[in-house]
Structures are given as structure tokens and as C-alpha cells.
Amino acid sequence: DRAAVKLHDIGLQLHRNGAGELGFRVFVGGGMGRTPFIAPVIREFIPVSQYLSYCEAILRVYNRYGRRDNIYKARIKILVHEIGAAEFTRQVETEWALLEPLALDAPAAEYERIKAQFAPPAYDASAPDSIDRSDPDFAVWVDHNIAAHKVPGYAIVTISLKPVGGIPGDASAEQMELIADLAAKYSFDEIRVTHSQNLVLADVRKDQLHALWSALNAADLATPNLDLVTDIIACPGLDYCALANARSIPVAQSIALRFANLDRQHDIGELKIKISGCINACGHHHAGHIGILGVDRKGEESYQLSLGGSGAEDTSLAKILGPGFSEEGVVDAVEKVIEAYRSLRLNPEERFLDAYRRVGAEPFKEAVYG
């Protein structure tokens, strides 16, 4: 799940029913921020042809019963939590029964028009389906930043915008110009932006990967760290945002520098660190394997550490580990958590998140607080 559908007001998950018809599983009432919730399913299947009117029914129920007495509780997730998923579902189904006959959904021609904009490019059926891995640095990048493609001879490339010590998700004008040129040359002129603050070239021939990597590497855009400890998501924080309580970027940079050694990163394995500078959770710290929240403690910047979050199919909300830390202290705490994980894991293949779920928070608390 690349869209964290269970952590939004309305989440739509495409799937097919028993008859093979395409539709959505509907989640409602998720969210992060001040009061995080995982959205429950309110309908297992709604056909694509009817999902707009169903979403309209959701919004009408919220408009009718949602809180207006408290700005912090004026959210769908609060209503679902207060009246319960079953009652909210009943209200939506009742409302939708009135709306569905009104033909509010888009006509089939509109869906076809939109679908045409996402038509697959002109793939070359003769593209070789192998990668020359003789260059060791290139091979490491392939192992970590390349994903399988459904078309033989092609690959999906993630361009990491997380060079060690850099600002997460940041790219210079020159780098963006280069990426645009490379997309035109190697990926049918298309660039996709991910929620993890990286870029994707979705349709690259395997026999052109080395040439692409060479160009990216020369521009410091070939860091092989996708989903590793230095692939950190961070909001702009106090450096740029008037809402923030603490800085996020320097913390991300310090953590990345602490774990700069690639062999160490690869040994740690998949680890998602997410940093928010305030309770609004723009950095998705609730969904981080390790989440960091910046708070104001009597005029001083402080950082709260949470563990065990996930925004994937196995959605979970990270739980606060204990008292907060200074900027330097939180980097030390993260390192202690990671070293505790390395000693606790059953084998190098056991991910941080799986180890945390197996042993719970206590061993990590002991490692951090003594």
C-alpha cells in the first residue's frame, strides 16, 4: 500500500470481487495529527461506476453530524470514532440509497477519457530482460533502488533524494533539469513523485539502466538507500514552517550522517524513519517504524520518540517510547534503538518492525532509558 489508505479520511483500495468486477474497498475515519486513528472498513466492495455517489453519501453524513463546536474535532475520523463504525456505516448506506438513483456518478465515457491518459507507453518487445551487474557500485544501486516491472525488459527506478547529509526530498534546479532530461531519454518523458519524498522513473529499459545510473551518480542522485535508515521522511519543520514547534531537517541530517556507512545501512535493513516538527504530523511520524515528533518544552525544542508504526497494508500507529530528548539526544536515542534491534532480531532478515512487534517496547525502553 503506497497510499496509506487506512490513514486518511476516506481510503479507497482497488480490488476485484468474486465476479471479477473492479471496485473499491472503502475505509473511512483514518488520520494522523493530534488524534491518530486507523480507518475501519465501512464497505467491502463498491463498483468503480458508483464510488463517487458513495463518497458523496459519506460527505453528506459528515456534514450533517460532524462536530462544529471544536475546531480540533471537526474531522470525519472524530465522528466515526464517537458514533462507531457500525452506526456511521448505517447512516452512509441509508444516505446512499437516496443518492444512488440520482445518477450522480460520472458517465462511462468520462472514465474512459481518464483511462486514456494513463495508457501504457510504446514498450519495445525486443528489450533484453537482463542487467549487466559487473560494475559493483551499480549492482548495489540496482539491488536497492530498482523494482520489478510487469513488462519484460523494463524496470522501475527510484531516484533517491536523500544523499547522506542532504535535506530529505530536496533537489537543486540543475538536478531537476537533469532528471527531466533523463526522463525524456529513458522513461517516456514521465516522472512520478512519491509520498516518501523521492522520484520515480517508471519505465526504464534494463539495458539502459547503467547509462541512467552513471548520469544520476555524476549529479549525486544515485544514493542506494531506498527504504533504509537514511531514506528519511521529514517535514520542513521550524526552519520553514510557522506551525512547527521544532526543526526536522537538522535531525534528519544528523541521523543520516550517523548512519552514513552503506554497509551498516544494508545490515540494518528496511527501516522507515519519519519526522514531524509539530502535532499536525506532515512527516507521518505516526506511521514510522521509528517516528520522531518535535514538541515545545518550555520554549525549548524537544523530540518525542515513537516506535512500531506502519502506513502499509499492515497499518499500525507508532507508540511513544518515553520522555523526550534534545536534538543531539534524539539522534543518540535512535542509534540505541537500532542497536537494540540488531541484538534482538532473530536473524538479519527479520525487519525492525517485525522484531518490535515480536518483543514489544520494553527491551527498547531499557536500551534507551536504562
Where do the PLM segments sit?
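Peripheral terminal and linker regions in Fe-S/redox and tRNA-modifying enzymes
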Residues: 1-370
